[in-house]
Amino acid sequence: MKRWAAGVLTITVLAAACGQQTQKSEDASPVRRAAPDYLSQPLVREIYTADPSAHVWNGKIYVYPSHDVDGPTKQDDLGSHFEMRDYRVLSMDKIGGPVRVGPVALDVKDVGWADKQMWAPDAAVKNGTYYLYFPAKDRDGAFRIGVATSRNPMGPFKPQPAPIKGSYSIDPAVFTDDDGSSYMYFGGIWGGQLQRNVNGRFDPNGSKTDLGQDDKPALAPRVARMTGDMLEFAEPPRPVQILDEKGMPLLGGDHDRRFFEASWMHKYKGKYYFSYSTGDTHYLVYAIGESPYGPFTYKGRILEPVEGWTTHHSIVRWNGRWWLFYADSQLSGQTRLRNVKVTELHYAADGTIRTINPFTSPKAP
């Protein structure tokens, strides 16, 4: 584990288009590259970070990432080697400027119901209170989603005594619409256990991957409107329907397009953009809808495969431009030790997103 140290790093943000497909297993060793081969450079180097959820509040940019550590668990397809134990918030006054690494904002030892694996978080603000949403495994080995509060966006955050009632799986992402209503999107298959919670109840003996039904609709992420105090679901979670160009649900066997994990929602010119990772094919993709509940029609790729296995992101508007926060394994070359990055995101005139290549040169053979 790397210790925190105060420091800054000036980053250079570039933009590019096009890319290539890379298919690899969870335990594959990434091909190492020289720093100039990457489109963007790591935001921080003091600690390993991933799964960046970025927000613009009070004129500043706050990033809520996972905090990767080098634990003893052997790498597997369930992500058991992702042994995160706490959260630290990154902040910056501008993209391209110094980045501050905050102290511990929340530690697993302070969450009474949680046992381990504090994976990808998100955050929200309402009436001066900041909310940190996070998944963790309970003592039965089931992922639940908790919430902690603070008056400071950097924390420290005080957790609620129990997870959100009716929550399960991983990757919470909270979107607040123009009318003030907030919605949580969540879920992830394989190690994220969505396939073990099909009926809202955790089955410890369920599938380790998905439902194994390639010719039937893929497992869908979930969405639920939040209560006014942002601490609970105001309704039972419902599936988020992702459709193809013919209006049919994406199938479980369509690994290049179907949902795997890493939900994110943003709004652009009145349309709702639901983006997510395809997991084992390593694409970051998106679909567009007319309502925060969907349905959403698949439109294409945002980001081609990065170095490392996972792709988890956020999209925010800052200074009149749109930005994609993501992560790769540039610093370590290990899938469990990642680093967050940012690059500019561009829309075409028709509202589609131009695909980004995370590298500046083709991959070596």
PLM feature spans:
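Residue-level signal for mature regions of secreted extracellular proteins and peptides
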Residues: I11-T12
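Bacterial N-terminal signal peptides that target proteins for export
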Residues: M1-V8
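Carbohydrate-active catalytic/glycan-binding domains of CAZyme proteins
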Residues: Q20-P365
